[in-house]
């Protein structure tokens, strides 16, 4: 449905070149929810703006539903964009128009008659859970309701693709989840392809079938959500996965951490388990095998794409040789181990 082929985007500040996107290649299948995640400045918003040609790529092609958008005239592009809906972080509703009239706007611009508009807008407001808000104004709506209006408006022209640019980042967690559930329902009912840009791995975990990770304008890693969570290949992927788990180190431990091992200190380690390692009794195995005691300070377990993943912060109480052997054993069994320091 969406093919992004060798896309580059260069911005210029005077004589300085800024490479926002570098040789991006992505193929997004019809009917999927595809997430693109990256930190601020990674290039993800530039990428989604290239998909509907709000930003023209410096080189490369953008193919949507078999049409190369980079080769279209302005008139052809305007017509083709009706197949591409888009929602933003900041809703972009017209404050002087009612909910009904905001959703009706694209239909009015397309020259639809009043009966068609009435029927379509009523149907869409029911779909997004705002059947009782026809005559309300944006100022009287919550953030979540405003985003629902924006979603309904984006669907007014029956697009085949819905682009979501940080659509939940201005919302509280409960409202975010309700909007994500709505997007899943829309994907299921309308078979619409959704390309979603976010900086939150929780969003990817909740809704996406596949994900691409972008850093510094480059495609770092891509795959199904299950593959990325089970077998992350890059440090950036590990960082995003880590952000979905609630782990904290007690303040008194942080104050006692030493950068190197000294007499009377013990290693504090962070263990990352993915895929099969989650269910393996590795912690009890190293305790018996290397005769060390283990104090678990915090741990968390979650699911994404049908895959379990988890993390643990623990202190190892053994002699230096046994502690190091235990750490090596865990690494040999595909556990990512990070020594955070040594607790004195």
Swiss-Prot record:
The keyword Cell inner membrane applies. Signal peptide: none annotated. Its EC number is 7.4.2.11. PROSITE patterns: ABC_TRANSPORTER_1, ABC_TRANSPORTER_2, METN. It holds the Pfam family ABC_tran. Residues 2-241 form the ABC transporter domain. It is a peripheral membrane protein. It is found in: Cell inner membrane. CDD domains: ABC_MetN_methionine_transporter. Its main location: membrane. It catalyses: L-methionine(out) + ATP + H2O = L-methionine(in) + ADP + phosphate + H(+); D-methionine(out) + ATP + H2O = D-methionine(in) + ADP + phosphate + H(+). GO terms for molecular function: ABC-type D-methionine transporter activity; ATP binding; ATP hydrolysis activity. The complex is composed of two ATP-binding proteins (MetN), two transmembrane proteins (MetI) and a solute-binding protein (MetQ). This is Methionine import ATP-binding protein MetN. The lineage of its organism: Bacteria, Pseudomonadati, Pseudomonadota, Gammaproteobacteria, Vibrionales.
